[in-house]
Amino acid sequence: MAKTDLHLTRNIGIMAHIDAGKTTTSERILFYTGLTHKIGEVHDGAATMDWMEQEQERGITITSAATTTRWKYAGDTYKINLIDTPGHVDFTAEVERSLRILDGAVAAYCAVGGVEPQSETVWRQADKYNVPRIAYVNKMDRSGADFFEVVRQMKAVLGANPCPIVVPIGAEETFKGLVDLIKMKAIYWHDETMGADYTVEEIPADLVDEANEWRDKMLEKVAEFDDALMEKYFDDPSTITEEEVLRALRNATVQMAVVPMLCGSSFKNKGVQTLLDYVCAFLPSPLDTENVIGTNPNTGAEEDRKPSDDEKTSALAFKIATDPYVGRLTFFRVYSGKIEAGSYIYNSRSGKKERVSRLFQMHSNKQNPVEVIGAGDIGAGVGFKDIHTGDTLCDETAPIVLESMDFPEPVIGIAVEPKTQKDMDKLSNGLAKLAEEDPTFTVKTDEQTGQTVISGMGELHLDIIIDRLKREFKVECNQGKPQVNYKEAITKTVDLREVYKKQSGGRGKFADIIVKIGPVDEDFKEGGLQFIDEVKGGNIPKEFIPSVQKGFTSAMKNGVLAGYPLDSMKVTLIDGSFHPVDSDQLSFEICAIQAYKNACAKAGPVLMEPIMKLEVVTPEENMGDVIGDLNKRRGQVEGMESSRSGARIVKAMVPLAEMFGYVTALRTITSGRATSSMVYSHHAQVSNSIAKAVLEEVKGRADLL
């Protein structure tokens, strides 16, 4: 394939709530850009982008498939790398990874549902990574569709600056096409060619006034970003050319100052080509984004790399997937330099050189082999032995570490065991591979029971993992009931002297420390251990201080109540003493671990549980039952709003421990008419009576409460 100029490359993702039609829109993009000859429908389970079996069965997208496609716009052929991202909240990690490596995004909304809870989460994630966006309001053919209401919600809920650049012609079942406010023409799609052909006509007479009004608002908004346009706008708006509007809108979009708004109905094949045109027109190319910044692992100095093939290589591995035919595929984005098939590349985390045996550009899950992937491009490689999500790949002569990604900690765990003992190895091998692919999924062995416990972001997340074990690794599992990932905390400050002595002939062990242990300071935000060394006059030699710190850090993994990790703690090392012969680093480490156990038991230990932020959309008549049920689940209702389809939105904070099987219960209460979505919010202290019950169940020490 011919090499595309970098300014004609677009690395984009489609981000949205579940069911806003992300995958259907991606399918249409592939159809119109000529990559698929038959359109895949999500509800038939045949969508090209949803290539895992579970996705096709459940009709949701779990892994971000990356696809490369081309589109002609304004005389040039653009190369579009399209990343389809999941909208289900349990798979937030996938979204976070995709946004890290994109240059721009299309935020898709449902014309009926508008800005939904997950849309808000994803919007904030895109803000965090400075990803410019255009918005696409889908499902304009559905009853209750209202384009301008979604524009209003984007402003109110997301605090965005939406700028409609189209006006729909008709709505609901009469939705026929769009008025393009930049060209001031009407576009109608032909149903007989599945929307592949369309006609451009004059604006219908009954829409001329509305179109002029919205065009005027659009010009007023973009004039702020272009001085020449501003003058024309005040002198004579009719002299403003299409090129000037496009240039001003592009600048404003790339600076994240406005969000151009389009609409359509992907399922009914209307509006997708206009969306593709404006993806090319407004979203940034790799050259429009800032140079990527990383640190040199040898010197710690900051370095930046330009998006050019002549620079030293730097690339970020953003996803690892196991493919049945080629084995482990590593998806990466090349920021500078290039990666060639058959060459060696250095992994700055592991410090090892790896050979990239083959390179591919992906079309959903089919691979097209390529020889080289250059700066600004996205591709996948085979042949890496030791690689994790977030690793930087670079030249050995010019190592660099790009900023990696932070992922939330898992909140729910279940114990699993294979149905037959002989599958034990298969199970651990399968779990290890899945944990490599997904940073929000962890596997550990419970020290007390010896069970294997897998943890993830929610029930659906773990269901899919168990399902994949069965399909991909042929392991059938028995699973325990879900467990909540509790934490522990201390509430009081305690002073303590701990002496550790061991004399068993020959050299003994000796350490003596005086510490103050308590909750962290309010301004200490990062969690973990806040360690302060106040030892004067060398009473404890400098080389033993890190061992004391290490002892406390490792001890915090097991709380005194039931062995749950302690989230944060402040330790002030005040004084102590040592023995010139018997003291060593290990003595001080063990002494710190003992001090931790003794002090925490007296420091008012409490149990902390994960609290979830819940939103339920329910019909008015079921509202009382839904709230009554939440009260039974120890929920705190924080607010209620009306949605425009006559339903009510209930927002509440509810402990995760009370939420198992909630989806089924909600279905029963509302006869299947309500929907809910849940995101982890924070950990909060559990009341004494509930803490006692939890501790008795896990055989913890309820006597310390």
Swiss-Prot record:
Quote the InterPro entries the UniProt record gives. Answer: EFG_II, EFG_III, EFG_III/V, EFG_IV, EFG_V, EFG_V-like, EFTu-like_2, G_TR_CS
The record lists GTP as bound by: 16-23, 84-88, 138-141
Q: Where in the cell is it found?
A: Cytoplasm
Q: List this protein's GO terms for biological process.
A: ribosome disassembly
Which organism's genome codes for this protein?
Answer: Bacteroides thetaiotaomicron (strain ATCC 29148 / DSM 2079 / JCM 5827 / CCUG 10774 / NCTC 10582 / VPI-5482 / E50)
- Give a short account of what the protein does: Catalyzes the GTP-dependent ribosomal translocation step during translation elongation. During this step, the ribosome changes from the pre-translocational (PRE) to the post-translocational (POST) state as the newly formed A-site-bound peptidyl-tRNA and P-site-bound deacylated tRNA move to the P and E sites, respectively. Catalyzes the coordinated movement of the two tRNA molecules, the mRNA and conformational changes in the ribosome.
Protein name (Swiss-Prot/TrEMBL)? Elongation factor G
Q: Which residues form the tr-type G domain?
A: 7-287
**GO MF entry, a single one:** GTP binding
| Keywords, in A-Z order | Cytoplasm, Elongation factor, GTP-binding, Nucleotide-binding, Protein biosynthesis
Q: Cross-referenced NCBIfam families, in alphabetical order?
A: EF-G, PRK12740.1-5, small_GTP
Return the GO cellular component terms, semicolon-separated: cytoplasm
Q: Which family does it belong to?
A: Belongs to the TRAFAC class translation factor GTPase superfamily. Classic translation factor GTPase family. EF-G/EF-2 subfamily.
Where is it mainly found? cytoplasm
